[in-house]
Amino acid sequence: MELFLPSVLLILTVFCFYYLFKPKQTQNAPLPPGHVHWPLKIFETFDYMFKAKTNSIHKFIAERRNKYNTKLFKTSHIGQNMVFLCSPEGNKFLFANDYKLVRSWWPVTFLRVFENAEEEITPEQVIRARKQFLSFFNEPEALAKHVSITDEVVKDHVKLFWDGSDEVTVYPIARKLTFAISCRLLADIRDREILDELLPAMGDVVAAFFALPINLPGTKFNRAVKGSRKCRKIFVDIIKQRKIDLFEKGRKEANDVLSNILLENHRDGIEVNEVALAKNLVSLLSAAFDNPSVTIVSIMKNLAENPEIYARVRSEQLEIAKGRAPGENLAMEDLKKMKFSMNVLSESLRLEAPASGTFREALNDFTYEGYLIPKGWKVHWSTHATHRNPQYFKDPEKFDPARFERNDPIVPYSYVPFGGGHHICPGKDFAKLQILIFIHHVVKKFNWEKVNPDEQMIRVPNLKAAKGLPVRLYPYNK
């Protein structure tokens, strides 16, 4: 009994201090509805994985949005307590609060694979490098130059992998194409042996973004780490040779990111950290080649399933071809005329955006829609929350490129295939450019049909055609 009263007083004191000093703005805010604890978190994870394999993540989101009748919910995803935002307003809120309430977040696998290059250079050098990358892929004058180079690469690719073939599997050769384009513009890599050495290693890197970070022989993560190191070594060698070519042999060409960065830094008297630059180039390459190749697969699938839409695309491209002499490269003004082809691209991105979305981390406790999002929790915006939601897109499961040429207004932030805010995809215009050029050349030469009529797109976890999309080709020049 002697200890009872002091114990009660101690407990009361602790509770008083807790409620007295608890942050006022969130003290009454509940967590979003959902499940993050055992054993229900296991069911959440497996349900997400199952729906991803059938390319129906939108159903995972819709079921919880409807169940809780909210614009957000909490769940356990990739080992994290995570809040899913389910509305255009949520997308806008998140994009507008980068570096204020949230910051970009990536799974630990991603960071370990790339061995963060930013740790080796100053913040000023990080900002400078990003500006150099962005200007090369975003400025109109630079993009106009890329059209002719990309056109050359696409024509060579079609001649090598498509001409004379009765059947092709689209995914692997589309990857070869977008990889060749990316390597050409990033570092002027044209040697097919180097491309053939880099591509499998980069494929291992991309395949492991969401793998378990277990570095044992034979695991995805182990292959990704080895692949990343191999690519960095190749790029360091390329950087060293390029410096010799530019500053000792007087090379004049500078139509790639690497040469422009080296020349600009040399002009300003800045010594380049070769390892850090190689890491940045590998990271940029991983983002540049995979998603456009998946979108090419999606477009090929959608055109095979919709012959009347294919006919409109071909008619548009043949009309554009009439304005060019045989063998003459396309120019930016030609791409601006590809209005219906652009609608096909946009609709393919709506239905099957290669990236499901990205992640943010809460910098501090904050509230949204009356719910508390605690510091350190992860927040996920997803294309699946709005792209296939009938509230924002009529007949959302229907492939209907005409929806982008009608006067029906698209709700702001409901169509977000490239994200938004400070972290919007920096290469979005370049990605569209290379896909449109590919469409131009392939529809001029071929019609095609799916070898497996029921083949669909799946996510494991990256988007891909279930069997790589083999197609039978019907060339027009036979």
Swiss-Prot record:
PANTHER family: BETA-AMYRIN 28-OXIDASE (PTHR24286:SF381), CYTOCHROME P450 26 (PTHR24286). Monooxygenase involved in the biosynthesis of limonoids triterpene natural products such as azadirachtin, an antifeedant widely used as bioinsecticide, and possessing many medicinal applications including anti-tumoral, anti-malarial, anti-rheumatic, antibacterial, anti-inflammatory, anti-pyretic and diuretic effects. Catalyzes the formation of (1S,3bR,4R,5aR,9aR,9bR,11aS)-1-(1-hydroxy-4-oxobutan-2-yl)-3b,6,6,9a,11a-pentamethyl-7-oxo-1H,2H,3bH,4H,5H,5aH,6H,7H,9aH,9bH,10H,11H,11aH-cyclopenta[a]phenanthren-4-yl acetate. The keyword Translocase does not apply. It is found in: Membrane. GO terms for molecular function: heme binding; iron ion binding; monooxygenase activity; oxidoreductase activity, acting on paired donors, with incorporation or reduction of molecular oxygen. It comes from Melia azedarach. The keyword Membrane applies. Mainly expressed in petioles and, to a lower extent, in roots. Its EC number is 1.14.14.-. PROSITE patterns: CYTOCHROME_P450 (PS00086). It comes from the Eukaryota. Keywords: Iron, Membrane, Metal-binding, Oxidoreductase, Transmembrane, Transmembrane helix. This is Cytochrome P450 family 716 subfamily AD polypeptide 4. Gene3D superfamilies: Cytochrome P450 (1.10.630.10). The chain crosses the membrane at residues 1-21.
